[in-house]
Regions:
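Short glycine-aspartate micro-motif
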Residues: 2-6, 61, 125-129, 218
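Short glycine-rich, Thr/Ser-proximal phosphate-binding strand/loop in the N-terminal lobe
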Residues: 2-45, 143-170, 174-175
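ATP-binding/phosphotransfer module of carbohydrate and carboxylate kinases, centering on a glycine-rich
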Residues: 2-4, 30, 158-254
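Glycine-centered loop/turn positions within well-structured domains
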Residues: 10-12, 134, 225
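Short, well-ordered amphipathic alpha-helical segments that serve as non-catalytic structural scaffolds
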Residues: 38-50, 199, 203-204
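Short beta-strand-loop/turn "lid" adjacent to the catalytic site in phosphate-handling enzymes
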Residues: 50-105, 142-148, 153-154, 182-193, ...
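Glycine-rich phosphate-binding loop signature in dinucleotide/nucleotide-binding domains
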Residues: 50-55, 120-122, 210-213
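Phosphate-binding/catalytic loop of phosphoryl-transfer enzymes
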Residues: 83-87, 92, 96-164, 193-204, ...
């Protein structure tokens, strides 16, 4: 089995693949203070939870956008899972052409998303990944990754409001009863959710004007389903898109 690991700023996502089929998968909170031994023991526990041992693993592929954790996770894989992980970085075969001015600046998760979309859905496409940051990524029919746009994720925006506006409370992101909020919490929920949806709709329209009217829109990440319920511009929700991309990258490098 192949273990895929996506290390993000907020979540650490793992999945076990048997061929192209995703089996057990986990989304954990990223802990920036955790040491390599702690990660290693946690990974062993997850394998045990899935009824597997390290002898069942045929490989590990890793994407990380958290530099200070990358080495710790690699060490955990080496010492506890007895595997040298394939790390998505420059020099790794991806099957796409990255047209960024400096390809080294493209996050490994964005690369994995693009690889998965091109293989599973084809281009032209706009991939929206709702994470700590929300990214919009443009992929052509020919397999070129053109770049995209990066903005603060909705939870990050909510935290900024709470932190920097003294009278605004911390609240859960839920759909308010109406766009016009009748109290502070509903007003914040309206601004964050509906304002965010409007931003997504506007960005999709702008991407479509450059990629063409046949552009597909694929959404992934923790808030993809929440946003998709409020708009019709999202064609496909693919919750584990990044892990699918990591699996494909692994296959391309064997």
């Amino acid at each position: 089995m192949l273990l895929t690991i996506d290390v993000g700023n907020t979540n650490l996502t793992l999945g076990l693949y048997n061929g192209d089929q995703l089996g057990r998968h986990w989304r954990l909170a990223t802990d920036h203070a955790r040491m390599p031994d702690e990660y290693g023991l946690q990974f062993l526990g997850l394998l045990q939870n899935a009824g597997k041992t390290i002898t069942d693993l045929t490989g590990i592929v890793l994407a990380s956008v958290v530099p200070n954790l990358t080495g710790r996770v690699i060490h955990a894989c080496q010492e506890y899972l007895k595997q040298e992980p394939l790390v998505v970085d420059t020099g790794v075969k991806t099957g796409i052409r990255i047209r960024y001015e400096d390809p080294r600046q493209v996050g490994a998760d964005r690369v994995a998303d693009a690889v998965a979309v091109l293989r599973l859905y084809g281009g032209p496409a706009c991939v929206i990944d709702f994470g700590t940051a929300t990214t919009f990524n443009a992929i052509t029919k020919a397999g070129d990754y053109l770049g995209g746009a990066i903005t603060a994720g909705v939870n990050l925006a909510a935290e900024a409001l709470y932190t920097h506006a003294a009278k605004l409370p911390r609240m859960d992101l839920q759909r308010p009863p109406s766009v016009i909020g009748r109290n502070t919490v509903h007003a914040m929920q309206s601004g964050l959710l509906f304002g965010y949806v409007s931003m997504v709709e506007g960005m999709v329209a702008r991407f479509r004007s450059e990629l063409g009217s046949d552009m597909k829109v694929i959404a992934t990440g923790g808030l993809a389903e929440v946003v998709a319920k409020e708009t019709d511009v999202i064609d496909i929700i693919s919750p584990w898109l990044t892990l699918d991309g990591l699996r494909i990258i692994w296959e391309l490098n064997q």
